[in-house]
């Protein structure tokens, strides 16, 4: 694993802090440490929150002390990596770009000095690594946006952004899972319900997964939305192998094993 430092976060959490940069290798170290700690079944650990460069480990101080958890984290960091050949998931998100679904697509195109069609193509081509979830339930912070598409936030945020809105802000792209105010440049919309609190698994994805945006027409959007409303739509989740040199911007280091799954 990459080098890290430990910081107390109150009396029932530890922040495991890696290098001060956003990097796929750091993300793999975070995912590996979390997996190692889970497999150790350390008494007293109550949960994990992975982020860009930290893993917050929550614990019950009655069951385990800070010092004991420090030792457990150190032990977990020494375990051999299992992520080099681990299967990773690519969750396919259908998106209708532009028009009423993407009111800021022209803004992004003008800023990038591209046509709207070129913006759309550059946006849906990569596989985006999910570094973390935050801000809203199921809001994904993604790595891998084409640098030319980086666009500042709106000068005046909107008071209401619809669930499923796909946007760009600075060097990041993401999806609003629920209605919210926000200042991201909205370029498209997915008909999927990304936050399903009534389900055992409320999200289709987790930190460490990838997202791929699949462009769809207005007609396809409405058809998918109808199936989602009726509970018939299956989200396509692709399974691939990731190697040590895998990154977040494309399929380098990811080998296709031809498998996939669906989820309502």
Kindly label every feature range from the protein language model.
Residues 1-264:
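Glycine-rich active-site loops that engage anionic ligands at enzyme catalytic sites
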């Amino acid at each position: 694993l990459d080098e890290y430092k430990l910081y107390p976060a109150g009396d029932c959490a530890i922040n495991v802090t890696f290098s001060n940069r956003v990097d796929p290798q750091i993300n793999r170290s975070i995912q590996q440490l979390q997996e190692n700690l889970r497999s150790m079944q350390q008494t007293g650990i109550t949960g994990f929150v992975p982020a860009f460069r930290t893993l917050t480990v929550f614990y019950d101080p009655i069951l385990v002390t800070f010092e004991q958890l420090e030792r457990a984290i150190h032990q977990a960091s020494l375990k051999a990596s299992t992520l080099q050949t681990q299967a990773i998931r690519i969750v396919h998100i259908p998106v209708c770009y532009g028009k009423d679904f993407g009111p800021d697509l022209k803004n992004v195109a003008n800023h990038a000095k591209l046509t709207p069609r070129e913006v759309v193509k550059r946006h849906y081509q990569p596989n985006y690594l999910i570094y973390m979830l935050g801000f809203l339930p199921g809001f994904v912070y993604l790595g891998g946006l084409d640098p030319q598409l980086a666009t500042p936030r709106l000068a005046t945020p909107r008071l209401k952004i619809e669930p499923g809105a796909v946007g760009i802000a600075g060097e990041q792209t993401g999806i609003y899972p629920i209605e919210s105010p926000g200042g991201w440049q909205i370029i498209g919309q997915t008909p999927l319900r990304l936050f399903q609190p009534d389900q055992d698994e409320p999200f289709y994805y987790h930190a460490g997964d990838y997202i791929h945006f699949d462009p769809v027409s207005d007609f396809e959007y409405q058809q998918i939305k109808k199936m989602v409303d009726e509970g018939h739509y299956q989200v396509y989740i692709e399974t691939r192998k990731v190697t040590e040199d895998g990154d977040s911007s494309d399929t380098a280091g990811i080998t296709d094993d031809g498998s996939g799954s669906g989820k309502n």
